């Protein structure tokens, strides 16, 4: 185990604000679901919002993957204090994310019924109608989300993390306030129901973007960057991003596509299963938020060591991180099992006995898989990405998603007609063995790949 206090200080300095930010985002989703599920048509409303959010999750993962891919390069250049190249990389990523957001908004607006038809059974008329209303508003939140998260990703990679927590707290109260006003009709506004939840999300994202933008270009001093810097790029850095960073984005994108297709299968199995899956996924997010936040910190500390060409220290960090995350996985599995009943009781839709029974079984299954999730996240999201081994991570996600998870879920649902909790288990079956792949990969040295360039090599 590493005894250097700076290692732990740096990792937790990055992870704790990020974890709190994730927890705040989690609270936003939970409060949103609670308000929507308390409507008269609570089960249908929650099913509609959760299924549209599975489409949004595909977009979100795509953008966050593109941003996370930049951290592979930024963290290593940060280890060398090469600020000029960090600004160029950020400019490249921001424009890519903005372009992706516009593409998604265009598709959602032009083909809304076809898009919702992917994740909702055509026979679920009430769910579909509500989903179309929600999607027509919430899709516009994709644009401010892309810009603000590109900014936040850059700041986190250069160890500026506290401001993102403050902004997340403000976003939480903004979102909850807007939800209360527009869903139920308060302060003189009409009660919009499900579309009100979409409007609240859009307004909260705009507020978040304004605050992040002002802080990045007016307040923070770590990196001297101005809006005009967004117009400056370098072709060779774009090629490096395509080589080392883009595989992360594509990997997350294809994995999110797998998630969307899993939601499509669930969407064919009734509103009760859709609602139960929404509640269960929220509980699983509670169980993994600290894990993935700490993995982001691991990515930075490992990336800095590799960027500084201190490979012995990178290996030492790797070994310590793996032990830490295995222990964290055990703890989080216990926490989820302990809290599942009171958590389920927060949802109006869980008053339906079918929904409640499904939630209890599915959360128990998910809790066990959290142990494997925690370990492989430390490797694939933290160690491997920070060390430049992003292509291997993308390959593992690709093979596991398309050759294992989707076929298993499809067969369980439509061929073997398995009980719904077993179908849910199949959606997470990869979490039971990816940890072994990660463990084997880190036994050698192939995962260490310095992706920075010396000045003369860049020309």
Protein language model regions, located:
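N-terminal transmembrane alpha-helices
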Residues: 3-34, 38-39, 54-69, 73, ...
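Transmembrane helical elements of multi-pass membrane transporters/channels
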Residues: 13-32, 137, 148, 171, ...
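Transmembrane alpha-helix boundary and packing residues in multipass membrane permease domains
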Residues: 18, 22, 33-34, 72, ...
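Helix-terminus/linker motif at the lipid-water interface of multi-pass membrane proteins
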Residues: 27-47, 116-125, 181-192, 253-286, ...
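Small-residue hotspots at the loop-to-helix junctions and early N-terminal turns
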Residues: 43-54, 131, 135, 271-286, ...
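Small-residue-rich hydrophobic transmembrane alpha-helices
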Residues: 46-106, 145-164, 276-340, 374-393
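Short runs within selected transmembrane alpha-helices of multi-pass transporters and secretion channels
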Residues: 67, 138-156, 164-172, 197-212, ...
């Amino acid at each position: 185990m590493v005894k250097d206090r700076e290692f732990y200080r740096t990792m937790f300095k990055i992870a704790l604000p990020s974890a709190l930010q994730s927890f705040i985002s989690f609270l936003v989703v939970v409060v949103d679901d609670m308000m929507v599920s308390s409507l008269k048509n609570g089960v249908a409303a929650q099913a509609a919002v959760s299924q549209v959010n599975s489409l949004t999750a595909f977009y979100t993962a795509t953008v966050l993957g593109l941003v996370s891919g930049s951290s592979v390069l930024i963290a290593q250049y940060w280890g060398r204090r090469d600020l000029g190249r960090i600004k160029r990389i950020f400019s490249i990523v921001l424009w890519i994310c903005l372009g992706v957001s516009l593409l998604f908004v265009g598709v959602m607006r032009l083909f809304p019924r076809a898009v919702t038809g992917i994740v909702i059974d055509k026979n679920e008329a009430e769910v579909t109608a509500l989903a179309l209303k929600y999607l027509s508003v919430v899709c516009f939140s994709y644009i401010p989300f892309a810009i603000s998260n590109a900014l936040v990703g850059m700041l986190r990679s250069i160890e500026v993390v506290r401001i993102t927590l403050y902004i997340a707290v403000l976003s939480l109260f903004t979102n909850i306030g807007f939800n209360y006003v527009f869903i139920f009709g308060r302060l003189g506004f009409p009660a919009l129901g499900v579309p009100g939840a979409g409007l609240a999300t859009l307004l909260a994202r705009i507020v978040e973007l304004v605050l992040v933008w002002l802080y990045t270009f007016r307040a923070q001093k770590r990196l001297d960057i101005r809006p005009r810097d967004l117009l400056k790029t370098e072709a060779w850095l774009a090629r490096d991003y395509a080589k080392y960073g883009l595989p992360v984005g594509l990997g997350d994108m294809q994995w999110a596509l797998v998630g969307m297709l899993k939601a499509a299968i669930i969407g064919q199995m009734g509103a009760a299963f859709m609602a139960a899956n929404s509640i269960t996924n929220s509980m699983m997010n509670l169980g993994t938020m600290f894990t993935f936040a700490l993995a982001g910190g691991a990515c930075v500390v490992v990336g800095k060591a590799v960027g500084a060409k201190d490979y012995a220290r990178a290996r030492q960090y790797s070994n310590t991180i793996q032990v830490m995350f295995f222990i964290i996985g055990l703890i989080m599995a216990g926490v989820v099992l302990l809290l599942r009943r009171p958590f389920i009781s927060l949802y109006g839709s869980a008053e339906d006995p079918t929904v409640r029974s499904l939630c209890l079984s599915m959360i128990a299954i998910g809790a066990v898989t959290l142990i494997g999730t925690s370990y492989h996240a430390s490797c694939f999201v933290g160690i491997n990405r920070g060390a430049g081994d992003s292509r291997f991570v993308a390959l593992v996600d690709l093979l596991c998603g398309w050759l294992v998870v989707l076929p298993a879920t499809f067969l369980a649902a439509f061929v073997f007609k398995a009980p719904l909790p077993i179908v849910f288990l199949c959606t997470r079956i990869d979490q039971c063995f990816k940890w072994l792949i990660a463990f084997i990969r880190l036994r050698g040295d192939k995962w260490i790949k310095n992706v920075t360039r010396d000045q003369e090599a860049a020309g």
